A protein has these predicted regions:
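Active-site regions of metal-assisted phosphoester/phosphodiester hydrolases
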Residues: 1-164
Length: 164
């Protein structure tokens, strides 16, 4: 087994550093040739996952009519386009199958189940913490343990998984 953990910095305060982190992580993982790999950590992404299975990245915006488009963040526009941001984030969060990895939580529950690992000050839930494993690995159980977050031990709920 090869296990990798990461903490992708939040884009709000780090901008292009977040994008570069995703790009570097994707490049590193695509050069690995390992039968059983696990990638886990705080990815500070995605912005939203819809019940339809559509993933909204931080490189996108949703307008009042629900139409999704590439975002242009004036704060980072000189360093990073919305397209680059979207692709970098999506390559790990959504296109992980290119790396022969599966999202452990989604492999068990699909997009019908909502569960969150972090909440904004306004109470908006986000699923920022992920475990990805090689597609040949079995997922026996997976859940977000809300107790450490609700007891204020951490601002994130850990994702617990039993893999085989």
């Amino acid at each position: 087994y090869e296990v990798h953990t990461t903490h992708v910095p939040p884009g709000s305060s780090n901008g292009v550093i977040k994008v570069e982190h995703f790009e570097g992580l994707y490049k590193f993982l695509s050069q690995r040739n390992v039968k059983n790999m696990i990638l886990t950590g705080d990815f500070n992404s995605p912005k939203q996952e819809l019940m339809s299975g559509e993933v909204i990245t931080w490189g996108q915006k949703v307008n009042s009519r629900g139409k999704v488009r590439i975002a242009v963040n004036p704060k980072w526009k000189d360093e990073c386009t919305g397209e680059r941001w979207d692709l970098a984030e999506r390559n790990i969060i959504e296109n992980h199958t290119d790396l022969d990895l599966k999202d452990v939580f989604r492999s068990q529950y699909g997009y019908e189940k909502e569960s969150f690992s972090w909440f904004t000050n306004k109470g908006v839930g986000r699923r920022y913490d992920h475990i990805f494993c090689s597609s040949n690995m079995r997922v026996d159980n997976v859940f977000y343990d809300q107790e450490p977050r609700t007891r204020k031990i951490s601002d994130h709920s850990p994702l617990i998984a039993e893999l085989g």
